[in-house]
């Protein structure tokens, strides 16, 4: 099976507020976990997935999280999306996780 292309997108995250992440573009599975890393830092914080549902007639999975991201001023946040083996696996029965990289920009205004 050919390697999958990671979906990429830009999101605007208000400073210090909760943001809902809707991530589309990969085959449907029954659940997942989002891991967030802040640029230039080692910290990794799991984001709880509030909703994971099939969209586009089961071709994609939409993950939504309302976890607060404290991204600071004008900082880019790189999300590493790890879709874990929950129920149906992403590609094969022995798939433990597939990483998708997204960038989230912090748009701060007063």
From Swiss-Prot:
Domain of life of the organism in this record?
Eukaryota
Any additional notes? Answer: Partially overlaps YNL058C.
What is the name listed in the Swiss-Prot or TrEMBL entry for this protein? Putative uncharacterized protein YNL057W
Natural source organism: Saccharomyces cerevisiae (strain ATCC 204508 / S288c) (Baker's yeast)
